Amino acid sequence: MGINKKDGQPQYAPSHLGTKPVKYKRNKGEKFHDKSNGHPIVMQTKGE
């Protein structure tokens, strides 16, 4: 009865850090890292 079901995680998922697969972190990095351009496109916003 030590598993808290209120946090929304599945029962089999570990709640402490360091046990998730490395591929999960790698995919997140690839999603945000854009290699197509040498420099990012800066969009002018109001007030800058």
UniProtKB/Swiss-Prot annotation:
Induction: Expressed only in the forespore compartment of sporulating cells. Keywords: Sporulation. GO terms for biological process: asexual sporulation; sporulation resulting in formation of a cellular spore. InterPro entries: SASP_SspN. GO terms for cellular component: endospore-forming forespore. It is found in: Spore core. Its main location: other. Residues 1-48 are annotated as: Disordered. Belongs to the SspN family. NCBIfam families: PRK09398.1. This is Small, acid-soluble spore protein N. It comes from Bacillus velezensis (strain DSM 23117 / BGSC 10A6 / LMG 26770 / FZB42).
